[in-house]
Structure formats: C-alpha cells, structure tokens
Amino acid sequence: MALWGTSFGGGHVLATAAANPRIGAAIIQNPFVDGRAAAAAAMRSAGRVATYRLAVRALRDALRARRGRDPIYVDLVGEPGTVAMMTTPDARAGFEAILPPDPIGWEPAVAARIVLHLRSDRPAAKADQVTCPLLVSVCDHDAIAPPDPAIRVAEEAPRGELSRYPIGHFDLFAGEWLNRVCADQIAFLRRNLIAVVQ
C-alpha cells in the first residue's frame, strides 16, 4: 500500500508512514511538515493585526469547544492581511483555480481552534523513522508550506527522494506542472512499489 498526501495532508502521510513500517511507499507534495516554519511564513503574509485577530478567534473557539458550543470558523483562504488560514498573494486565486465550478455543500473554512495546535505540529521530526521509500515533491517558491523543512525530510528519511519544482504552492495542481509532477510520482511508484510486487 502507498500513501499520498498534499499540503497539510502531506504532513499526516509523513507521520503515518513513520508510525507504520508496513507501508510500501509514501509520497508527500508541497507538504506541511514544520508548524513553526509555516506559522512564521503565515504571520509574515497576514501581518500583525490579522494574526492577532486570528489568535483571538482561535482562543474564543477553543473556549466554546470546552462548553460544547458551535465552532467559530475562519476562511481557509483570503487576501493578504485578512483573517484566514492561507493569505499569501497566490492563495485565493490558486485555491479557487483547483475547485470544481460549483462545490455543493462545502464551505472552505475550518474551526479557528486549529491555529492553537499548528506551531507544535512537526511531522518532520519523524522523518528518520520512515522506513519505506518516500518521495518528497517540493515547490521551491511555496510561501504556504516552506520548502526548506521538506527538503530536510527528504535528506533525513533513510529512503527519501527529492523532486523540486520552480513553482508556488498551488501551481502543481494544473497544467504542465500537474503533468510533470504526476509523471515523476508514477515513476517513483513503479520503481518502489509495483516492481517489488511483481
């Protein structure tokens, strides 16, 4: 079995692969692997005022959760300086470009309390525990999931491989880059998973 994850899901795949030696291969692309680095990048993009407002909402939401009340949500993406999870200049346009034309029944928002846990989320610390082949696909101009921690994951994982692309976080989800990334990931799976099974 192979695991695949992108962005925040990439961090979950890394942690799962580190905890389960039965995984045959894993691929993480533009992965969120270091909460401290991602939080610093997010604060630079959002600015002080929006970061403060996001923190206040997160604390209020955490208190509401303790009392069993409905969550306070924040948008997943927004323009720089707004209260949202991703506010880089490319975030809103990049995110909207990958959505289906009419995503029925889904609101791109999360419970604000997640902000309180992001800095301590560091799946990169488990890279040396990943025993399966691991492909780390990194976007060199990623302002959401900083590339340097992901590059270190590829270096520290015993069977890590690194693919780098001169693009931003959302650029690998469409067009030429999608085709290139998919070709690299399929080749990785053929080498490390399918060839082993045959």
Please tell me what each predicted stretch does.
Residues 167-182:
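Catalytic histidine-centered segment of alpha/beta-hydrolase-like enzymes
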Residues 130, 136-138:
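Short beta-strand/loop motif that positions the catalytic acidic residue
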Residues 184-196:
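C-terminal alpha-helix
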Residues 108-126:
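Active-site nucleophile elbow and catalytic-triad environment of alpha/beta-hydrolase enzymes
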